Amino acid sequence: MNIKIFFKSLEGAYSENTIRSYRSDYMHYSNWCQKYNYDPLNINEDKFSDYILQMGESLTVATIQRRVASLSSIFNLTKSTNPTKEPVVILTIKRLRRKFGKPQKQATPLTYDILTKLKNVCSDDIVGLRNKLLLQLGYETMRRRSEICQFRFEDLQHHGNHKHALLLRHSKTDQYNQGKIIPISDELSELILSWSLAI
């Protein structure tokens, strides 16, 4: 199988971020295979376990698990032998998790007090207005950076009784772009309108 053609075939079916992650993980694995003259798409479980153990010398368990999950998907989609489901591979990952596993660091949540302090130090010019809008938008919608960047002015909706909402066109959990309506405050609605008039 031509791996370049394979990754090209994923376009439109998977998000750009997923394809980028698959490609990066595969290249790391493929380079390792090349070093030992292994066929990346026809490898047995013992050799794949060696790859995992070598990753364990420098990478976190979370990164290793993500790479193994990516490679498992690639093996399945290319109809190749999938060593990731073999007991020896599963046990190798379990050993690494027991030996090196640490709880993943969670991002510090943006509380209302922190939000207020951040907005208070924003300047009164157009840059400050933009920063206030982004802070309020992130706080209220709890969206990823990539999702926040997709919002458009026409996504702002006004309903009866002074209610406002934003249309979220796409998210990681909405791969088929069905969209989702997110209620927002008067404050965020006013910031969006102010920004639209300022630019």
Give the ranges of each region predicted by the language model.
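Alpha-helix N-cap/N′ positions at the starts of helices
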Residues: 2-5, 47, 110-114, 129-130
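N-terminal core-binding DNA-recognition domain of tyrosine recombinases/integrases
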Residues: 3-20, 26-105, 121-124
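Hydrophobic (often cysteine-bearing) scaffold residues that line and stabilize catalytic clefts
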Residues: 67, 130-131, 188
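DNA breakage-rejoining catalytic core of tyrosine-based enzymes
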Residues: 98-116, 175-187
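Basic, Lys/Arg- and aromatic-enriched nucleic-acid-binding interface segment
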Residues: 113-145
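Conserved tyrosine-mediated DNA breakage-rejoining catalytic core shared by Y-recombinases
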Residues: 146, 150-197
